[in-house]
Structures are given as C-alpha cells and as structure tokens.
Amino acid sequence: MSHRPRKRFGQNFLRDPAVIQRMVTAIAPREGETLLEIGPGEGALTEPLLARLGTLTAVELDRDLAPRLQERFAPALRVIEGDALALDPAELAPAQGRLRVVGNLPYNVSTPILFHLLAAADVIEDLHLLLQREVVDRMVAPPGGKTRGRLSVMVQYRCRVERCFNVPAGAFFPAPKVMSSFVRLVPHRPLPARAQDEAWLQEVVTAAFGGRRKTLRNSLKGLVTAQAFEAAGVDPGARAETLSVEAFVRLADAARSAPAAAAGR
C-alpha cells in the first residue's frame, strides 16, 4: 500500500522487513489480547500483528490512509480516524485485563502522546514504541546521566523502561535525519514511590530541570523550603540530574504543604 508521506504529520513509514520482524518478536502478541496500534501508516506492522492476534484496533490521523487500511484489513482491523491525543485508552481496554499499546510515533508529537498514554497507565499492560533515539536516550537515563531530565524522571516514575534495539534511518521511507529506538515501557504495579500529588510532583520536577546548571536551591526557590529539603534528605546544593525518582517524590511530598509550595502553586 503506497502512500506519499505528509510532512505535516511527521510521517516516516517503516519499510524494513527485518526490523518489523524484530519488533513483532519483542512485542510477542498473543491471540485474545487487546492491542491498540497508534499510527499504523501503510500497515507494515499491522499485517504481522493481525496474523498473531486475529483482531486489532488502530488509530490513524491521516484521513487518506485510514479508509485504505480499513478496506485492506477488514473485518479484522478496526480503524479509528483521528488524533491519538483525543483517544481515551480506558474506553478501549477490555473489561477483564488491560490494553497493550504499539506505535511508530511521529517525532513532532511523540512526547505529548507518551504523556497522554502514561496518564492512563492503570489500564495499560505495556507499551512498545518506535521513537527518536534521542528521546529514548532521555527516557532511560539514570541519575547522574548527561541526558537525564524531566522526561526521564516522569517516565521512570510511572514505568520500567527498556530500550529493545536501535533502528537505522534507512529502515524508513523517507529516511529521517536521525536514528530511532524501539522501547518497551511496563507500568509499575504498584508504584515503587507514589507521590501524594502527581501534578505537584511534575511541577517540582519541571522547575528543577528549568536551569541545567543551577542547584536545586536556586531552581526550586519559591517552591521548596530549606526545611523541606532537610525533611526529604535531599541536598539543596545538588543538581536535578543527580536525583533518583524516589528522591524527587520525597522532596515533592515534603514541600507539598509548606508555605513556599502553597505560594508557588
């Protein structure tokens, strides 16, 4: 199924059969599971997934591709024409069990889609996503890592993250200017460290990484008091990239009811 890629959708279609087979092996779909594919494109991954699953739901934004996919794979494939950001995963999850999610996400909207899916982690079994390698570098970065940032902390707060393998630009048409990585995310059950207020945790983490060279004392001024740093056991002279997820949770919880936190919200 040939289709001219649209730049405004950030379309890069997967064409390499060897890469597709590696992805299917990593996903290991089993008949009877409920799986959602985001951005099926030309159906390169859809076809082998359907061979394993029998049925599949896909969401496709491109209104030219959506009906062609439906026609090609009917009745086994259900295509939802629209934006993945407008989709509620809870509505697609089975009554018993959870939803599995697979996707080759457009680089220009990959982070918003990722956070949208993480917000529904309670109904998601796992996610297998093809993303820009630079994004995955940040997702898997450990404390002290050069690429550690807000994305690292918030993704690792919610999930166990594993890079499955890297994918060369030549596996796509048109070939992007960057490498890609295939990544597996498995939501924690239960969370190793649960924040009292997850929106507040995200606010603290975002502020902490607002100035890469700043100490936490400076980047969190007005949000976190000296007393909160002490209560959390966090050095205010440290930099954000050195903190673990657990340390951020302790810090956010300690600051949550402090006067400085209330003033900064």
Curated annotation (Swiss-Prot):
What Gene Ontology cellular component terms go with this record?
cytosol
Query: Which Pfam families does the entry mention?
Result: RrnaAD (PF00398)
Which locations, inside or outside the cell, does it occupy? Answer: Cytoplasm
Q: Is this entry keyworded Aminoacyl-tRNA synthetase? A: no
Which SMART domains is this protein grouped with?
rADc
User: What PROSITE patterns would the database entry show?
Assistant: RRNA_A_DIMETH, SAM_RNA_A_N6_MT
Q: What is its EC number?
A: 2.1.1.182
Q: Tell me the keywords, alphabetical order.
A: Cytoplasm, Methyltransferase, RNA-binding, rRNA processing, S-adenosyl-L-methionine, Transferase
One GO molecular-function annotation for this sequence? 16S rRNA (adenine(1518)-N(6)/adenine(1519)-N(6))-dimethyltransferase activity
Q: Which CDD domains match?
A: AdoMet_MTases
Enumerate the residues binding S-adenosyl-L-methionine.
12, 14, 39, 60, 83, 104
Report the sequence similarity comment from the record: Belongs to the class I-like SAM-binding methyltransferase superfamily. rRNA adenine N(6)-methyltransferase family. RsmA subfamily.
Which PANTHER family did the record assign?
DIMETHYLADENOSINE TRANSFERASE, DIMETHYLADENOSINE TRANSFERASE-RELATED
Could you identify this protein by its name?
Ribosomal RNA small subunit methyltransferase A
| Protein's organism | Halorhodospira halophila (strain DSM 244 / SL1)
Q: What is the lineage of its organism?
A: Bacteria, Pseudomonadati, Pseudomonadota, Gammaproteobacteria, Chromatiales
